[in-house]
Amino acid sequence: MDSQRNLLFIALLFVSFLIWQQWEGDKVSQNTTTTTQVSQQADMPSSDSLAVTGNSNEQAKLITVKTDVLDLRINTQGGTIDEADLLAYPAELNSKTPFRLLETTPQFLYQAQSGLIGPDGPDQKSRPVYSATQQEFILGENQDELRVPMTFVNEEGVKFVKTFILKKGQYDIGIEYKVENPTDKTLTMNFYGQLKQSVKLPEHRDTGSSNFALHTYRGAAYSSDETNYKKYSFGDI
């Protein structure tokens, strides 16, 4: 009952906010960045100005990953998906250009970030620079699964292998971590994932709405100590 009351209260606050935005008239564009939380058990990195930690002489670069339905650019700095094209969906009607779901440009940011945080997580205070054995990974015609491993070794010799898992005909992307700890220390860390998007949309993504707050709203989610994370649609609210 308390959970239901809390959900109704959150919905009421959101509706009141939209009414106030419409009444205000003058909209203010902001060049800030918002994040959509996927899962979190510790404080997530909050700034792109964090230091970059990498393997010796390793430079961040973009890795190309292709399946029959996805064309990705994965940044070895943190293992962030910088770009994602949906090959089966055109950007416009009768266009041969695929729809770009995720993109990273100086003017606009929409990324899928993930990492390990916590006291011993490599993403806690910096974005590690991983190394990859290939510049390009392509799912073969006779393959059902494509695995893209990237490796990072910290100053203590702990080895982190972050592997992206893609399957034929599917759009979901799995992430697997393997941690090899040669030290006597017990390591504590948690996985986090987030979608990071600029508030101000470029023209090709602008839906025409005059309310900037609507651009980044994706629906509501609620959880408590008694109930698991659950997503609610507009109809449920």
Swiss-Prot record:
UniProt superkingdom: Bacteria
Membrane topology category: Multi-pass membrane protein
GO molecular function, one term: membrane insertase activity
Cellular localisation: Cell membrane
Ranges of Polar residues composition bias in the record: 42-53
Cross-referenced InterPro entries: Membr_insert_YidC_N, YidC/ALB3/OXA1/COX18, YidC_periplasmic_sf
One Pfam family in the UniProt entry: YidC_periplas
Stretches that traverse the bilayer: 7-23
Alphabetical keyword list: Cell membrane, Chaperone, Membrane, Protein transport, Transmembrane, Transmembrane helix, Transport
Region (Disordered), start-end ranges: 34-53
Annotated GO biological process: protein transport
GO cellular component: plasma membrane
Subunit structure: Interacts with the Sec translocase complex via SecD. Specifically interacts with transmembrane segments of nascent integral membrane proteins during membrane integration.
Family, similarity comment: Belongs to the OXA1/ALB3/YidC family. Type 1 subfamily.
Known function: Required for the insertion and/or proper folding and/or complex formation of integral membrane proteins into the membrane. Involved in integration of membrane proteins that insert both dependently and independently of the Sec translocase complex, as well as at least some lipoproteins. Aids folding of multispanning membrane proteins.
Protein name according to UniProt: Membrane protein insertase YidC
Originating gene: yidC
